[in-house]
Amino acid sequence: MLSALIQNGMSKSGDPTDVENNTTNGSSSTTDNANDVGRGVNTENNSKLENDSSNAATITTSKQDPSAVDEATTPRSINTGASTVPEPDNTRRDSVSSNVSTATTESRRRSKVSRACDQCRKKKIKCDFIEGHDINPDQSCTGCRKIGEKCSFERIPLKRGPSKGYTRSNSQSRERRGSQRRRSSSEVSQKGKKPSVSNPVNAVNESKSEVDASLHPGQSATSTTNVSLHPLLQYLPGMNHSAVSASSPSALQQPFWKVPYHEYQNQRRPSLDSLASDSSQKPGGKTNQQQPLPSQSQPQSLQNIGNSRSNTGPLPTQDTFRNQRYYYQPSQDSVSEAGSDNRRGSSAIPPLLNPAIQLQQQQYSYSQFAIAQQQQQQQQQQQQQQLQLQQHLQQQHQLQQQQSLHSPQANTMNASTGISNGGFVPYSGNKGLPSGGHVLERTDSVASDAMSLNASPNIYTAEVESAPASPVQKKRKRSNRSSTSKKGKSTQQNLPATTPTLINYGQIADAQLIDTYYAYIHLRFPIIPINKDTLTNDLLLVNTQPISELHELNNYILLWFRNSLELLIRICLKDKESEEILYQQSTFVSAINECFQKIVDIHPRFRDLETQIDEKIATIYLVTFIILNCTLALVSYNNSFVLGMSVIIFNELKLWKNFIFGNWNTVTGHDKICLRLYFELNTFDSLQSCSFGVPKLMNLKLDETTASKLFYDEVSNDGTGQETDKWNVDEDPERIRIIVDNMELGYFLSRLCQARRSSFEKPLPLVGEHNENKTIPGLFRAFLSIKRQFTDTLLDLPDAEGKLPEMTPELVTRLSNMICDLTTTIHDLLKLNVEVNPTNCLELFPDNSMQTVDESSAHNSAAQSSDPSNIEVGTVSPYVIAIYKDLFNVVELIKNMPTSLIGCVMGTQAPNFDSQPLVLQLSQCMNNMLQITTFTSSLSPFKIFKHELNAQSKNKTIDAVPLWKQKMKSSLAPLQTAITPQEIMMAQFIDIAWCIADTEELGWFNQ
């Protein structure tokens, strides 16, 4: 019934013959309009199946002549408005429209519906639901009829088709987009040459309008004032919204540049470290959109060159520093950053070239001919600027001296930064600061880095406040505030490893840094291989006034020496993990990379001025590399780049020649310090090779007496040898003995790397008796020697054919003695580590308040004089984590061997063999194993990088084949099949020896 009515209605509205028969008094114009209406209805019904048939006819008719509305819609309203045909539901509009469209051609029903019911869709079967009470009285399909339910269409269908705003132009290739960006940037760069581009734009718009008119005849051009413009078009002169009113059809789609741009699309947003090398930024904090072309920027270029310093000229004053680039100043109205004026954050690498040369390099591709004409004028103006700057600096220097004499507060401020007018202040006058020590903020130039230690805080704050800020910098400041917490410290999520972080240097005063180092670090590893008095009263007394490039370099080296030393101290602090931002891995790596990069970047200049640089500065420069390598060893972080670059720089200074040709008895004091530093770098190289299995980078000519020759010096108690005592590594003979003992461990590690089985060059040196080495370095040397003997004995048990020997009383006694000696050494070594410092950290501020220099010095001297055996208590060492890891590996492998040996001893039958002493000895060994487990749980030397101790024991089980054994399998005979219990036990011991050999060849941290 429904199909007949619909067919009748559609035939009356769609067939022009029916319309003409039903209309008796219609004119020819009315008939033509009716024909147009019929054709419009058919077209609309076939193209838009989602609309209702009555609505489609009404909408289509309204677009044409109004006179034909009544005649065209009357038959359709009669058919669709009959009482027998129900009003179609909105949710089923798609089904009705589908039936209406198919009924226009023939009266057959579609073979499938446009949408399956919920039950059929859930079962994934075909649905034959037909809408209509006459055709389908129970309103259910075949599947639902079988289970006695009605079809339901409650599920909301998912959206189909492409996402909103998708255009084919947005998916074009990257090469095409890159070419468009380059063309856009080149067009933007020509704005200084073209007075106006409005006429070409209007011509383009007119041509586009003609194309649109030809494509859409009879339609008026629609307004496109709401369409967003491309960011590059906003910077073209004469380009506005009305000028681009008619664009291409793709521009009418949803634009993908929803966020307004403030910089060109072909430019990236610079980070803190990329500002110095980003060509999109210019001095004064202005972007390229405000920088004119070279033909128009001659006065500005000269001004910038005049304001910048030369390689040999003086440092700019505070007025000229306001014109320097890339001030990263905080917001003045931010409460959380009220004290950020005293914060020195990470900056970009200081340029090693003259800023004038850098400016020429940046402009060379655009103004290579104009610069040749400007050179003479630039030189003249630069000389005038230098004379004015020198006069201004002299006046400012005199004013600072007068203020420092009359103002004790200014003296305290200058002492806190470590440099007072003439250079680093003497240690006696360097007082500590409160816990929130003064920190300065740096800019991105060498001059500003040098200035940060010389200028007074008030002057530098005024410069920061008056520095210009570009829109890009303001954006970065807002993002910086959002990425930091209320305390001004960033969280781990906001500190990626690739982005430099803001490290607040200056939290510990300079006097406290030096005092803490000599009290807790210098004793077990002399990173600064000179005594305290010589360092503070001689080496650090360097002229750092910004008069020439040489003084500027001195100031820069002192700055990063101090920052590196503070980084080392802060890593060693105890109970600071919850507060110290450096305990985050990404922040620590960024801080290490920043310090190392800063000190490496000045090496070309250091090498050029090597003959003019003072020996004191050269020593401090080399000490900075040792500090950074020691920091990495304290956390056991494998960074071969830092070590490799350090070795390269040391080798460029030809320090290795003194180990071959030099006479150590006649070397000067500074040369001896350099030899000590070179020896310490070799120690870190050996430690990293043993820990991670990497190849050794240095191969020095060393022997057993090298450490004592370099570090042991006689101390004169009567004061007659004051000149010779000046270059001693320490002032106390007992402390010198401990230092030499630790340096001998470094030599032993170097020999251990050379004595590997893979490249056997030299045997291990002999180790003294066990009772004579009750120190941590001595016990560890004994442990390494016994471990090598133990593994060699077990690996040599099989003969050339792979047969295992019999378990004789001599072999049982030998193995029992070696396992007992090894266990006793491990027990004593772990016990001593627990007594000295179980966490390998120092507690600098026990009451959350900084101690003064005099109080800490008096406390240390009293402790040393009252109980010399407790000198090492509370000190830290870079060896501890490596020692702990190697001990843990061996304990996990041999912990069951004493029990097996007791059973073997009890089962050995020999006429003259007394098993009772061996059983007692092995029982004591088992007792030591229990205490070793307790000591292992008490030690926690790991910081920042939490190494999994059980990872190696999981891989080095008895069932797994050791890696080194697999490599040596071709040169070894296969072992015979173990049958007896003694043979099975011996085969297990041999596998344990192979696992221990893995750690020696591939590193203690090998996993």
Curated annotation (Swiss-Prot):
Localization, UniProt: Nucleus; Cytoplasm
Coiled coil: none
Biased composition (Polar residues): 1-11, 42-65, 74-83, 96-105, 196-206, 274-288, 304-323, 329-339, 404-419
Region (Disordered): 1-115, 155-224, 267-350, 399-423, 462-496
Main location: nucleus
One Pfam family, short name: Zn_clus
Alphabetized UniProt keyword annotations: Activator, Cytoplasm, DNA-binding, Metal-binding, Nucleus, Repressor, Transcription, Transcription regulation, Zinc
Signal peptide: none
GO cellular component, one term: cytoplasm
UniProt KW Nucleus keyword: yes
GO molecular function per UniProt: DNA binding; DNA-binding transcription factor activity, RNA polymerase II-specific; zinc ion binding
Bias (Basic residues): 473-489
Gene3D superfamilies for the chain: Zn(2)-C6 fungal-type DNA-binding domain
InterPro entries, alphabetized: Carb_Metab_Trans_Reg (IPR050797), Zn2-C6_fun-type_DNA-bd_sf (IPR036864), Zn2Cys6_DnaBD (IPR001138)
UniProt DNA-binding residue ranges: 117-151
Function (record text): Glucose-responsive transcription factor that regulates expression of several glucose transporter (HXT) genes in response to glucose. In the absence of glucose, it functions as a transcriptional repressor, whereas high concentrations of glucose cause it to function as a transcriptional activator. In cells growing on low levels of glucose, has a neutral role, neither repressing nor activating transcription.
Protein family membership: Belongs to the EDS1/RGT1 family.
Name of the protein this chain belongs to: Glucose transport transcription regulator RGT1
Organism: Kluyveromyces lactis (strain ATCC 8585 / CBS 2359 / DSM 70799 / NBRC 1267 / NRRL Y-1140 / WM37) (Yeast)
Gene this protein is translated from: RGT1
